[in-house]
């Protein structure tokens, strides 16, 4: 059945993001020679109206689902729903085409082209009977989104190309209908689409938090859950705010569509924070509170794909609709309040005795490479109106990283909330190395010596409190390269000088010499007295002086560099 799934996945990857502004969708109804609708007209209209209400709320724009006439197709259900070794529902495209052609007198397909590109946005086919996904047999219809072009069968009606289509069944309910239509907006499946392959069954979003997960299978199928921060982020919808230290309050997604994002240094990898309340469309959610997602749509490697027989990046998994196929490399997963959670009720914050989140107590609050998120969430509490309040702090913050050819100076601060009596350590390694070198820091500064020019490095600063609690922050940098044929010179940061070359008052100099690969020591003076860098690795200029660097090389020779310093 591999080829069947692959065909559907490739089609999903072609779907376009949602179009801003009002839009219409058409629900065409098809029954078969041997299977007729049990749903009456009033029930069908209620389904269309509910779909309209749902997407209008989720997209914050008017979405209207129109109802087409009931069309009786000339063949039995098995004719259209039969599976081959190459494709599921091998002739479903004929059901779509025949229903469209039979509905043309009652339906103006030109109304369903929101972006006026000459192509109908989607045709939603609602079929009679029970679906194959509900164990109705291999010849029953499988809910899906696909393209007629997959069969080279796209055609035109009312001046519009008919290509993209979704299929649901009368038994599947509103939730499945909305799920399949949402694929046409550009949303991917967030459950494990290859089942137990690729390393086992991944939890996805716990089968409840997302319309695109197995949330469509909870309750009686009548309540699709609200779009989560993940769906809104993918579609560019809702209000996304960057997380920052301070007090925060988030209202339930069903009423505000506002969420926070914690970015990372890796483009496409980030965390999303939202509030959910088990009411309205989320009544079947099974939980309420603060939900945190780790999203990866980057070029990070995510392991082997059993379907594509190759390693995939996170971005490729989104393209191929294999977002959460590997339990050890999910591209969207929930940072559960209880790391050992076995039910949706144990996912959100707060939980009894758990109203804080940091990377030490919850390993899921780390980037894919294992580096801790620098933020800590504390005092998480739910309010009577369903909202959640909490505080974000940054216990350990890098203030600056000065990079040279053979060294780097790191300066950081420790938040008063964790106390100043902490022990700090710095660990670093080149990008081609696996073993870290580390050193204890005196205070909140550290100079890494002996680095290779023109090399990429990663450094991690860790602060450990008296009670053993640890916080970390990471930085990546590239050391400066040597200038071939250039004499040694005093390295002076441009930020410390004025446009005319003079120095700013209280300028901070790192007292480093560049292009001196053979130097074994450097003695610094201000023309009168020997000077040394302070605790932060810098020397502060307090007045005009003659800056002098006396270099002793490996062969015993000496170089002297003099720089006249004028402060303005």
State each model region's role:
Residues 408-419:
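Conserved aromatic anchor
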Residues 467-481:
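Extracellular fibronectin type III
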Residues 448, 537-545:
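Solvent-exposed segments in extracellular or luminal domains encompassing
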């Amino acid at each position: 059945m591999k080829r069947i799934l692959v065909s559907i996945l490739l089609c999903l990857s072609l779907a376009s993001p949602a179009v801003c502004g009002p839009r219409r969708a058409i629900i065409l109804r098809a029954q078969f020679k041997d299977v007729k609708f049990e749903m009456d007209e009033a029930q069908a209209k209620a389904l269309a109206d509910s779909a309209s209400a749902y997407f209008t709320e989720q997209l914050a724009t008017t979405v209207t689902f129109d109802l087409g006439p009931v069309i009786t197709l000339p063949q039995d259900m098995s004719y259209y729903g039969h599976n081959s070794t190459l494709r599921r529902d091998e002739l479903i495209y004929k059901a779509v085409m025949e229903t469209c052609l039979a509905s043309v007198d009652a339906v103006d397909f030109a109304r369903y082209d929101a972006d006026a590109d000459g192509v109908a946005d989607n045709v939603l086919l609602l079929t009679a009977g029970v679906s194959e996904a509900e164990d109705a047999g291999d010849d029953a219809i499988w809910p899906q989104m696909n393209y007629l072009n997959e069969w080279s069968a796209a055609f035109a009606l009312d001046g519009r190309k008919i290509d993209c289509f979704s299929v649901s069944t009368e038994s599947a309910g509103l939730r499945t209908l909305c799920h399949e239509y949402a694929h046409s907006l550009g949303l991917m499946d967030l459950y494990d689409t290859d089942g137990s392959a690729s390393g086992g069954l991944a939890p996805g979003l716990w089968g409840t938090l997302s319309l695109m997960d197995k949330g469509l299978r909870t309750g009686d199928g009548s309540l699709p859950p609200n779009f989560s921060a993940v769906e809104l982020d993918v579609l560019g919808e809702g209000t996304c705010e960057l997380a920052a230290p301070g007090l925060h309050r988030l209202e339930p997604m069903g009423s505000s569509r506002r969420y926070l994002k914690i970015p990372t240094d890796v483009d496409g990898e980030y965390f999303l924070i939202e509030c959910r309340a088990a009411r309205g469309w989320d009544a079947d959610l099974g939980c309420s509170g603060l939900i945190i997602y780790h999203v990866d749509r980057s070029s990070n490697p995510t392991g082997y794909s059993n379907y594509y027989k190759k390693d995939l990046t996170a971005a490729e998994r989104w393209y191929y609709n294999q977002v959460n196929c590997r339990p050890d490399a999910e591209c969207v997963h929930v940072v559960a309040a209880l790391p050992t959670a076995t039910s949706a009720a144990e996912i959100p914050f707060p939980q009894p005795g758990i109203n804080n989140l940091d990377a030490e107590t919850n390993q899921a609050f780390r980037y894919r490479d294992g580096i801790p998120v620098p933020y800590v969430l504390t005092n998480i509490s739910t309010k009577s109106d369903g909202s959640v309040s909490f505080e974000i702090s940054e216990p350990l913050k890098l203030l600056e990283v000065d990079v040279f050819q053979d060294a780097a100076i790191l300066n950081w601060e420790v938040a008063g909330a964790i106390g100043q009596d902490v022990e700090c350590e710095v660990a670093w390694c080149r990008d081609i190395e696996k073993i870290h070198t580390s050193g204890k820091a005196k205070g909140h500064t550290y100079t890494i010596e002996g680095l290779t020019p023109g090399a990429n490095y990663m450094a991690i600063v860790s602060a450990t409190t008296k009670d053993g609690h640890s916080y970390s922050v990471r930085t990546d940098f590239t050391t400066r390269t040597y200038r071939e044929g250039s004499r040694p010179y005093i390295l002076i940061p441009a930020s410390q000088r004025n446009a005319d070359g003079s120095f700013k008052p209280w300028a901070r100099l790192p007292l480093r010499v560049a292009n001196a690969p053979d130097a074994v020591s450097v003695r610094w003076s201000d023309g009168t007295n020997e000077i040394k860098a302070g605790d932060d690795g810098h020397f502060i200029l307090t007045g005009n002086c003659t800056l002098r660097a006396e270099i002793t090389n490996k062969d015993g020779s000496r170089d002297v560099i003099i720089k006249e310093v004028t402060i303005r």
